[in-house]
Amino acid sequence: MEKLSANKIRQLWIDFFRERNHFFIESKPLVPQNDDSLLWINSGVATLKDYFTGKKIPPSKRLVNSQKALRTNDIENVGLTSRHHTLFEMLGNFSIGDYFKTEAIDYAYEFLTKKLKLDPKNLFITYYDGDDITFEKWKSLGFSNEKLIKGSRKTNFWDLGQGPCGPCSEIYFDRGPKFDSRGSELIKNEIENDRFIEIWNIVFSEFNNDGQQNYTPLKSKNIDTGAGFERIVSILQDGPTNYDTDLFLPIIAEIEKNTVFRYKIENYFLKEPRQTQINKSFRIIADHIRAITLAINDGVQPSNLHRGYIIRRLIRRAYWNGKELGISHPFLYKLVEIVGKTLDYRFDIPTISKIILNEEENFAKTLEIGYNLLESQLKINKNQIKPVTVFKLFETYGFPVELTKEILAEKNIDFDLSQLVEFQEKHSQISRAKKTTGMQKVINSLTQIKAKISDFIGYHTHHIETKISFLANKDEEVAETNGENLSYVIFEKTPFYATAGGQKHDQGWIIQNNSTIEILDVFKDKFLNNIHVFKGKIVKNQPVFLKLDTKNRLNLERNHSGTHLLFASLRQEFGSEIKQLGSDNNEDRLTFDFPLNRKPSDQEIKSVENRINSYINQKIKRKYLVTNLEEAQKLNAIMTLEESEYMDPNSLRLVIFDKITTDLCGGTHIENTELLEKFTILSCQSKGSGIYRIRAVTSWNKYFEFLKGKIQEILSKISALKNKIKKIEPNFGLNLPNLVDLEQQFDYLKKIEDDLRIYYKKLLKSQLRIAKSELDANKIIEIGKFSFYLDFNLPLHNLKQIAATWREQNPRISFILGANLVNNEFLIIVSSAILASNQILEKIFEIFTGSGGGNYKIAQGKIQKKPEKEVFIKLLWENITEF
């Protein structure tokens, strides 16, 4: 057995199967594309499902991959056991209707014994009882009955309850009695152990389950294999665990630079309790930073929702384990570069590091206060924890519920998780189900269509006489429509583009027997037929004339091509790793979603816009190229658009704007960039979770419409600013000239707005100077280890700004300020840098009837009357541990 590097082992796998005519599929992103059934790519075959179901045509009947995958369902075992990981790689070789059992077993045996030079004496095989072909094949390779372990339906038959299924055969490697004195009964009895390591599983998909447990042979038999990359590496590098390899040890060495503690491989056998805990923390950090790095690289931003919540949870769990190693400063971001060296993937190291550093800094700000709260509550409640405290730790201090549970488990303390169900649903539940739209129901109901019966000719043809292939009222095929309901038609040939790839469907008309009927919608069925929606009378057995609305098509093409140019410009501005998360192009405007770890500046957005307008001025011709997947990859074609999922890999359509971008796309596009006229970014807004959406238009008409709207917005802002200034300077006046040119008017009014805003801020600052010098030391009250400043006799005007200013100047003091309102009501403002202002306000409302809200730093509300200072002090003493 030769000791090989992880990268060498991966390459040996790929090369071995390429030499045997397998097409290599590169590892896909961890975020599933067009598959709402999965949160993450969690297996090697997950990205290939459409090939096995027939939804997409595979580039070859033989495939090989090395797919990164992510699972967090058993995260509590990560670092504790030898082989549990959040991020892992699966090596896979697949046959779709090509070779079957004999060849699959031959390939596995040859790779393990010839390429990796594993001793066959150390291999044990499981097989399904009754699968004689598999049993005899392994026996012919020299395996004795003692090495061939008979499995049951439970252990050696893959069946999801409906659809393709079949027996499987697993390959185990025996690491010897030093790992466990017991023998092969560990495999037979499914006992968890570190001696017999499952390294390969071959699934023979040869039956179809109709859902009623009736099994029939498949016409096309398939092979689906999975080999555990980290497990194979640990065996070849003789590491006691997966962590003791060149996939993890360089990361662990980098962690050691930040702590006095050391990771000790030999402790696997020594099992010294304190060192076991130390090793566990090192492993958790090393494991999690790999998952964090790859997930962020694939476009996931840490947040409190969906996938972002899981990544934030991993960051905070890793950071907490750093604290267990005595690391009291951000350090995870420093590990990104070494992760890049241990894995064979391209990373945007600076961007990923910044995102992680920001997360660490945010968590560090509240970690100590939150942990102190937890400790104090445990002391007060005699090692019992209230669900409300767990809730507060998450909402206020950013402790994931699961992390709190782990911390408590280490202290042998349990808490009632059932009372947190509503909270967890609100903050971290991930919905995987989407409502089926009415249109999808129509598609599903058109069961009469069994194949592709229509051709799209609309790239170059805008009108045609053709025949009807299919005609239906609702979900019932008819010879003639009644004209009363929405109806559906498929033509032999059609110039009408169906909604796909972010581009809206074409508009136009059906003409038959001097009757003109408007096209209302066009969508695709599962066979990629364009289904046209209309309302009117049509006869199936008579020809029809189809006429495209060319003006509408031009606007669609402008916005679709504009999307491609926008994507190219964004890559120029923010780096080649920028991702497209979604786009929507109709005749009026385009939208484009992309992830970024910060809000793009106005200057950056303007730079993106100017670059696109330079593309327009260059008058670059659009080209189309139809090629195969391999050639498209050589051209560095961008292959992230949705339409690529439905293309034949041997007939891919590329849209090319020379020296700008080459994209895989099935949509329609302008012939020359000059047809875009004028590219204008209307807005760039956050959608949350680090995702931004750009809205833009691509013609002069739409640009002028936009300008008129912006001018009205600016005039409203100028009016509001003028009114605010007049409250401070009653004699202030402003006259605006009437300019005809829209661009001149916009520029002039924008400058007026900016000048007024600056002037208003100057007026406010002059008022706040007084506030900055008036902090009265006699009004500071010490409650426990916290300081409060109480003043209920302040002027109403600018009270919120005064509260914010005092908080910034005195971050260790929490401010509770008040001022009289009309009708004897009283304004309360809470402002604090160290306690939850909004929760202090909630406690005030429990004593004094009122309403309001806010956030951690500042909150305000109204109560019925001016409170007594002594009541406030009593309230603070009684509730200080809750804030």
Swiss-Prot record:
It catalyses: tRNA(Ala) + L-alanine + ATP = L-alanyl-tRNA(Ala) + AMP + diphosphate. It is found in: Cytoplasm. GO terms for molecular function: alanine-tRNA ligase activity; aminoacyl-tRNA deacylase activity; ATP binding; tRNA binding; zinc ion binding. The keyword Cell cycle does not apply. This is Alanine--tRNA ligase. Belongs to the class-II aminoacyl-tRNA synthetase family. Catalyzes the attachment of alanine to tRNA(Ala) in a two-step reaction: alanine is first activated by ATP to form Ala-AMP and then transferred to the acceptor end of tRNA(Ala). Also edits incorrectly charged Ser-tRNA(Ala) and Gly-tRNA(Ala) via its editing domain. InterPro entries: aa-tRNA-synth_II/BPL/LPL (IPR045864), Ala-tRNA-lgiase_IIc (IPR002318), Ala-tRNA-ligase_IIc_anticod-bd (IPR018162), Ala-tRNA-synth_IIc_core (IPR018165), Ala-tRNA-synth_IIc_N (IPR018164), Ala-tRNA_ligase (IPR050058), Ala_tRNA_ligase_euk/bac (IPR023033), Thr/Ala-tRNA-synth_IIc_edit (IPR018163). It comes from Mesomycoplasma hyopneumoniae (strain J / ATCC 25934 / NCTC 10110) (Mycoplasma hyopneumoniae). PANTHER family: ALANINE--TRNA LIGASE, CYTOPLASMIC, ALANYL-TRNA SYNTHETASE. Binds 1 zinc ion per subunit. Gene3D superfamilies: 2.40.30.130, 3.10.310.40, Bira Bifunctional Protein, Domain 2 (3.30.930.10), Threonyl-trna Synthetase, Chain A, domain 2 (3.30.980.10). Consists of three domains; the N-terminal catalytic domain, the editing domain and the C-terminal C-Ala domain. The editing domain removes incorrectly charged amino acids, while the C-Ala domain, along with tRNA(Ala), serves as a bridge to cooperatively bring together the editing and aminoacylation centers thus stimulating deacylation of misacylated tRNAs. Zn(2+) binds at H560, H564, C665, H669. One of its GO terms (cellular component) is cytosol. Pfam families: tRNA-synt_2c, tRNA_SAD. Its cofactor is Zn(2+). GO terms for biological process: alanyl-tRNA aminoacylation. PROSITE patterns: AA_TRNA_LIGASE_II_ALA. The keyword Transcription does not apply. Keywords: Aminoacyl-tRNA synthetase, ATP-binding, Cytoplasm, Ligase, Metal-binding, Nucleotide-binding, Protein biosynthesis, RNA-binding, tRNA-binding, Zinc. Its EC number is 6.1.1.7.
